[in-house]
């Protein structure tokens, strides 16, 4: 049975700033897939979906009661999550037709911030973000066209994963601007957001914008170059300015290096979304309904859609050409940086202030978001700190199309470094868990254990990452090996040799997986006296790994007592020359 929060009608507006306004409808009992495996990857996790996403048997309202229709089938992404064992508990409020970044543009009521009900929650995926922040669900789906999957995350101390365009099917989603729409994921940890993405992604032949995207599986460098706008705008909000500086310091503590970038062309691209003929796609998405029922659409959404109706085809072509020219201008940025870092939202806005000046205040919230989908980038909003006034602050990590897993790796490190609790629940951050590894599909692969200069962050690690290798885990060898520092090797390398039972030790190794097609060229780079052989891990399994000829050990220092190459290198750095 569907339960609406007013217990009378699905179309009665909820009170402004009422926490119940986060929901448009709840399901009782929750919806589950009876055929889902009990040990599915999302088994038992409770989730909600933004009410512009179809769920069979439920009305889809897009926060416009007159527009509502009964969905005959699940959206592709909903079906995939249910099949993975997740349990659907309701549909959430949004800025009408996903047109806004603030969460107040809904006849069902304004969704308040989870930390202070006087402030906006951010939108348009307002309800989804709030119910994750408050712990009512484990994760939720939103959509993101101009920042709707990121701004609410940043304002509510949760993670907002905005995938590469077409990575998650948008079939069964009411379009906002279909060519750049993305289904987004809200969770309280990066790890869970990545788990949901691993289930949700995949091509869909019934979605014209779905893509079978190759994902970058090599982790970002341990010391990434982070691009930061040379000029920043916080609209007079000193607390947010200080919080962003603190966030950058956290990244630097993780080894990142700041690189100033020119934000002007990105800002110009952002402006195209609403200040050019590109806004016509907003109108086209709901043209038939809007032309017949314009009065049913609330302001300022009505004005935005009407603006889109005024443009002609030639205007749209001009805007697209301008976008491509700006994209060409921006592209060289990626030669100098590994990731772009911006404030998710530059300020917090009260509901009162938003209603007094809805266009300007909404535009301010999107100062660092609107360009991302137009340029086909991936993005991840990560909480980093609480401001001096106790309100949440987060940054968005942005990378090229297909960098989703790379951003998740860095985002997880940054989130854990923050020391924050989860959302508005007060729950402590759990121990870091390994992110799910994106599947290689039908591509044959080889696993190899590395022990020395090929470890993450070491000089030869690039020989793995440039071949598309993925770091699976850090583990230890079986206690059958000894480790030696080989003299005269550049860069310095160890030699690992198998010894008789009782004479060896368990040594730290990393297990990587790479496409088989790249394995031969990797092995060809290994110089004598090193080679590849079979190595036994502490769990008894065997993988390919680095071995060393015993003749090369003459004059080599036995460093087995360090337990691994990284600790040996660290000990040398700590010892005065």
Predicted regions and their residues:
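A short helix-breaking turn/cap at a secondary-structure junction
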Residues: 33, 162-242, 265, 409-412, ...
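Short glycine/serine-rich loop segments
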Residues: 74, 79-197, 373-396
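Glycine-rich, small-residue loops and helix-cap segments
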Residues: 44, 83, 134, 138, ...
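Short helix-loop capping/hinge segments that flank enzyme active sites or metal/cofactor-binding pockets
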Residues: 42-64, 223-225, 277-331, 383-391
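Short Gly/aromatic-enriched secondary-structure transition segments
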Residues: 61-68, 460-477
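Short, well-ordered alpha-helical
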Residues: 1-70, 75, 97-100, 244, ...
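ATP-grasp fold ATP-binding core
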Residues: 40-56, 88-91, 172, 227, ...
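Gly/Ser-rich, acidic/histidine-flanked active-site/gating loops
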Residues: 47, 53-56, 80, 182, ...
């Amino acid at each position: 049975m569907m339960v609406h929060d007013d217990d009378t009608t699905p179309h009665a507006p909820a009170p402004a700033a009422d926490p119940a306004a986060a929901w448009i409808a709840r399901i009782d009992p929750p919806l589950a897939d009876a055929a889902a495996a009990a040990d599915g990857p999302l088994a038992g996790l409770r989730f909600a979906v933004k009410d512009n996403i179809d769920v069979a048997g439920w009305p889809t309202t897009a926060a416009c009661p007159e527009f509502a229709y009964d969905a005959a089938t699940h959206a592709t992404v909903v079906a995939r999550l249910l099949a993975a064992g997740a349990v659907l508990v309701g549909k959430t409020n949004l800025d009408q037709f996903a047109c806004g970044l603030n969460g107040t543009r809904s006849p069902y009521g304004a969704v308040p911030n989870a930390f202070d009900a006087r402030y906006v929650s951010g939108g348009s995926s307002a309800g989804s973000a709030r119910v994750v922040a408050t712990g009512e669900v484990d994760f939720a789906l939103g959509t993101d066209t101009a920042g709707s999957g990121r701004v609410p995350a940043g304002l509510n101390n949760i993670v907002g994963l905005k995938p590469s365009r077409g990575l998650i099917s948008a079939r069964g989603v009411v379009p906002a601007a279909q060519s750049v729409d993305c289904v987004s994921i809200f969770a309280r940890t990066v790890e869970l957001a990545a788990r949901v993405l691993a289930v949700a992604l995949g091509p869909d032949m019934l979605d014209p914008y779905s893509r079978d995207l190759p994902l970058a599986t090599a982790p970002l460098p341990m010391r990434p170059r982070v691009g930061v706008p040379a000029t920043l705008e916080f609209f007079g909000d000193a607390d947010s300015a200080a919080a962003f500086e603190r966030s950058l310091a956290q990244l630097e503590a993780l080894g990142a290096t700041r690189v100033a970038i020119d934000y002007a062309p990105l800002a110009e691209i952002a402006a195209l979304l609403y200040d050019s003929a590109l806004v016509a796609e907003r109108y086209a998405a709901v043209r038939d309904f809007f032309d017949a029922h314009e009065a049913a659409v609330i302001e300022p959404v009505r004005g935005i859609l009407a603006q889109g109706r005024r443009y002609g085809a030639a205007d749209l072509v001009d805007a697209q050409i301008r976008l491509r020219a700006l994209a060409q201008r921006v592209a060289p940025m990626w030669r100098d940086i590994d990731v772009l870092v911006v404030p998710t939202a530059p300020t917090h806005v009260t509901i009162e202030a938003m209603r007094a000046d809805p266009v300007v205040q909404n535009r301010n919230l999107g100062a660092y978001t609107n360009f991302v989908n137009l340029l086909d980038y991936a993005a991840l909003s990560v909480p980093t700190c609480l401001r001096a006034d106790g309100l949440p602050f987060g940054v968005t990590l942005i990378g090229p199309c297909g960098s989703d897993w790379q951003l998740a790796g860095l985002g997880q490190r940054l989130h854990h470094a923050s020391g924050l609790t989860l959302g508005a629940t007060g729950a402590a951050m759990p121990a870091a868990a390994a992110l799910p590894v994106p599947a290689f599909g039908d591509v044959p692969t080889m696993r190899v254990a590395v022990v020395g200069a090929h470890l993450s962050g070491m000089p030869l690690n690039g020989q793995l990452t440039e071949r598309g290798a993925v770091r699976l885990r850090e583990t230890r060898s079986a206690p059958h090996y000894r480790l030696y520092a080989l003299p005269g090797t550049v860069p310095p390398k160890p030699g690992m040799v198998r010894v008789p039972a009782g004479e060896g030790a368990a040594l730290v190794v990393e297990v990587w997986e790479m496409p088989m097609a790249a394995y031969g060229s990797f092995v060809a780079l290994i110089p004598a006296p090193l080679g590849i052989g079979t190595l036994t891990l502490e769990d008894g399994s065997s993988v390919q790994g680095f071995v060393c000829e015993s003749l090369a050990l003459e004059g080599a220092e036995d460093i087995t007592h360090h337990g691994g190459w990284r600790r040996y290198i660290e000990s040398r750095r700590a010892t005065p020359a």
